[in-house]
Amino acid sequence: MGNFACVDEDSAHAVSILAPYAFHVHAKDWLVHEFEEDFPSGYKTRGCRRLVGCSVGEGNMPIKRCLAILKSAGYDGYVSIEYEGPNDCIEGIRLGIENLKSFGVTTE
């Protein structure tokens, strides 16, 4: 869900276009820093935004909205987590799982 931000696209809009074709999704979140050239870390998008990875549900990506779009399109598959944050990866994933559960995603 968050990868669309890497090319300055609206994640919810992109998910709405692709949802009917989805057979697997992964959730990823970013803290977006608008047009900060001197930002010391993260990724620089083609539009000069800086993206810093964070736990799913802790950033600026519309994760809940994307999940709702997927559900309304009939997606009932797995949601994997992709964590690229600066903190411990186990803790980052644990927090992402908690947040996804609070958004209505079930675990097995």
Predicted regions and their residues:
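Short, well-ordered coil/turn segments that N-cap beta-strands
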Residues: 21-23, 73-77
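A general structural detector for well-ordered alpha-helical segments in enzyme core domains, enriched
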Residues: 14, 18, 65-66, 95-100
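A short, acidic, flexible beta-alpha connecting loop/helix-capping segment that sits on the rim
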Residues: 80-89
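Acidic/histidine-rich catalytic cores of soluble enzymes
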Residues: 1-60
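A short, acidic, amphipathic alpha-helical segment used as a generic capping/interface helix at domain edges
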Residues: 58-72
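C-terminal helical cap(s) of enzyme catalytic domains, especially alpha/beta-barrels
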Residues: 89-108
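Active-site acidic/histidine proton-transfer and metal-coordination neighborhood
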Residues: 6, 64, 107
